[in-house]
Amino acid sequence: MKKIGTVYLVGAGPGAEDLITLRALSLLKSADVVIYDNLSSAFLLFECRKDCEKIFAGKIAGHKCNSQDEINALLCQKAKDGKMVVRLKGGDPFVFGRGGEEAAALEREGVPYCVVPGVTSAISAAESEGIPVTHRNLARSFRVITAHGASCLSEAYFSQFAKNEEETLVFLMGVSSLENISKGLIAGGMKSNTPCSIVESGTTIKSRRIDATLETLVLRAKEKCVSSPAVVVVGKTAALNFKSSAFSLSGKKIGITGTSQIVEKQRKAFFETGAQILSGAFMKIDINEKAMQDVFSCGFSCVDWIFFTSSSAVNLFFDAFETSEYDLRSLFDVKFAVVGGETAKTLRKRGFKADFVPENANSESLSKEFVQKFGKSAKNVIALRADGGSKEMNAVFEAENIPFKDFCIYRTKADIDLLSLFAKSSEVLDFVAFSSSSAVRAFFDYCRETKIEGLKESAKAVCIGKATFETCAKEIGEKRCVLAKNCTAESMVDAVLQNSF
């Protein structure tokens, strides 16, 4: 008899991809099937296994959608097929998420299930824009109310909480019901000058706050073209704004592009500055098997120096080395030159210390400073790097008549689905960080092909490497491009700081 699988009713959090819980993320990475609703952060779905079956069960206005009974039946069926099922819901599954109905259906069918709490937007969306739902001497409690179907609610319904001035009211799914909320609360006895705030797309890169009073709530929403998803906060705490401006990049919105490793390093560096970050890890590494075979076919007995221009090149080379006919003794007489400190750290983890690191961490300095230090005494140099890199290194070695071979052992290509998610949010960015020409081309080509607006005219691009800068300048002009001094996350942050004001 086939073993019944388990269904996990999982909260995805309010929208920001890094506000999902560790337990939820672990389950998402292990699931056989993910049945998901409309998510503010669709990036989460890319955490799933490649063979995971992903089924959309959300509701889109004007489109036919699954009924709750159909969703319940689907959950039960997938579990009875022996699958590990994650039912992924925005926010928390038991806060207006029909998680209770699904749990009851699973209970009736004898299907094992587990509830994994999520961060609810009822608190976090307001909080992300500086609004506490409770505050001493202002609000002793808060009430979370679904505004879905508010047009059917009577004045008597609103009157039960309209007169409590020490309570914060939080309405979810309330954009289409703002007029009913406003009129109902005022009719129930709430003062028309009561502070209100609408938080649109809270915790995400598109988050914005629109302040009003109960009387002006509808007008302000129309003026600002408010759209879902949004949380409506009513009460004294809606007048507060606990959002620090002490950080160096407070209020700035930064998009970071590249491979997942590059994006994560830069994200950490920018996070410390108080910037809002849109992660764009849409570039994937594709190893060039032929070039890698050529490296090993040549052998290492006649190689004096190996140049690495990225951590990716280091890892790809040593991964291939482990499965080759060679062992580490083959490299006993080889020296290593790397582009910068981060690449040197990666090399150290592989058991080798870099013999040369340029003062300025970029490909041009790597070759020029190397020649200045070693001159023509350097011989038999090979470079292992990405396809499409700067040809400056080739020119430097040719000019000095130093034997040099260039192996493009990998290329980077865009994951269209991830690129699409990034591009659709890019119009709000103040800066976008590019670490390669391929990322620049992928982004701007996609925006042109899909007619997505892309970067606003005031946005600037911060680039690592001269080749990346030149590629970007062709797209948006040199005045809007900034060249980072070195190819490090810290250098990217410095470049943004110097061009922010």
Stretches found by the model and what they are:
Residues 7-8, 85, 142, 169, ...:
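Conserved hydrophobic helix-helix packing surfaces used for dimerization/oligomerization
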Residues 14-15, 52, 61, 67-80, ...:
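Signature of uroporphyrinogen-III synthase
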Residues 1-17, 22-119, 305-313, 332:
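Class I S-adenosyl-L-methionine
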Residues 37-50, 116-135, 335-345:
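Short, compositionally biased "basic patch" segments
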Residues 107-110, 133-135, 187-193, 324-331, ...:
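A short alpha->loop->secondary-structure connector
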Residues 152-197:
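Conserved anion/nucleotide-ligand pocket segment
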